């Protein structure tokens, strides 16, 4: 249908403002606002029909009920809602009153257009408010994961400002044993610290099995510096509570909810964390990251290197140890869920590869064993056999009982590519 005929039918329904008129043909001619399209149509229609040009005040429009005059007002209200928040990107969404949606559907019908012709009122409102907000705050629109997100409810005359999480990536070393990665609630009282009216005997009333954690040494510092409401620790797997995490450290991301600050000095933040942890934990390589880095550390396949101090139940000679280790190297191990974790892991048999294995005797009853293995390989059970649940094992190959007395993780690296990818970091 000819656009002037569309305009004639639309304006014949009553007072229609330029924006609502132009929205009917929003897919025609780029570089114009809908108000400019509508004004051009109204002018062309007057010229075609040789009639007086009669502009329509937006406040009198029966379609939007004057809402198209409010773009500036809502942009200013949005800016006020986040005036004490640091952000670089934003997005705007709108809930229009049902009557306006009904009005614009009726206008399309009267103009002889399909239901999906042109552009919805909601889309224009989002864009026009967003453009003005961007100019006011000197920030950029984002349709992916903006720093701040607004929902305008026109019927309720309300604006909701959501400040999305920010993320800090790094690697940590755990330099003391008996520190879990994250808080470990007591199984007996389920973290309440109580058994009925009395303090829980199992955890001493604290609600936790351990006093400290890597999370507690790191996340509160980041939350405080970024002035957030809560911080969550995401690790690339986790070492045993009694194991050290040394070498290159383990990748992690700390997510801070509703941060008021995003542009922080990561070198200073790193120093603050290390000072707070006081030698129990240390972090390095802190960088501002995107949400994608959370998925990366949680899902990326990782290989691990371990150093284990091993005690044998009987004397072992160097040749026998070397032969057993050589047989382990390059093999695929079958591990049924270990006894020590079967209360919290599914009872299945897992296959894991041993990439490299070396060992050196300290004396006939003690050795240092180093293993490079696939992620998810249970090292303690690879040494002990776990009552036959792991095959093959060092103990089984030697025919001698073996136990890990101290375990260190010395490297956590991506299987096929590094954890760190530049597109997952922010400036």
UniProtKB/Swiss-Prot annotation:
Q: Any idea of its EC number?
A: 5.4.99.25
Signal sequence span is none
Q: Which Gene3D superfamilies does the UniProt entry name for this protein?
A: 3.30.70.2510, 3.30.70.3190
Q: Which GO terms describe its molecular function?
A: tRNA binding; tRNA pseudouridine(55) synthase activity
Q: Where does substrate bind?
A: 306, 378
Q: Which Pfam families match?
A: Pus10_C, Pus10_THUMP_arc
**Domain of life according to the entry:** Archaea
Among InterPro entries, the record links this protein to: HSP_DnaJ_Cys-rich_dom_sf, PsdUridine_synth_cat_dom_sf, Pus10, Pus10-like, Pus10-like_C, Pus10_THUMP_arc
Recorded catalytic reaction(s): these are:
uridine(54) in tRNA = pseudouridine(54) in tRNA; uridine(55) in tRNA = pseudouridine(55) in tRNA
Presence of the UniProt keyword tRNA processing in the record: yes
What residues make up the catalytic site?
Answer: 240
Recite the UniProt keywords alphabetically. Isomerase, RNA-binding, tRNA processing
> Biological process (GO) annotations?
tRNA pseudouridine synthesis
Q: Report the function annotation for this chain.
A: Responsible for synthesis of pseudouridine from uracil-54 and uracil-55 in the psi GC loop of transfer RNAs.
Q: Which family does it belong to?
A: Belongs to the pseudouridine synthase Pus10 family.
Stated name of the protein: tRNA pseudouridine synthase Pus10
Q: What is the species of this protein?
A: Halorubrum lacusprofundi (strain ATCC 49239 / DSM 5036 / JCM 8891 / ACAM 34)
What's the gene?
pus10
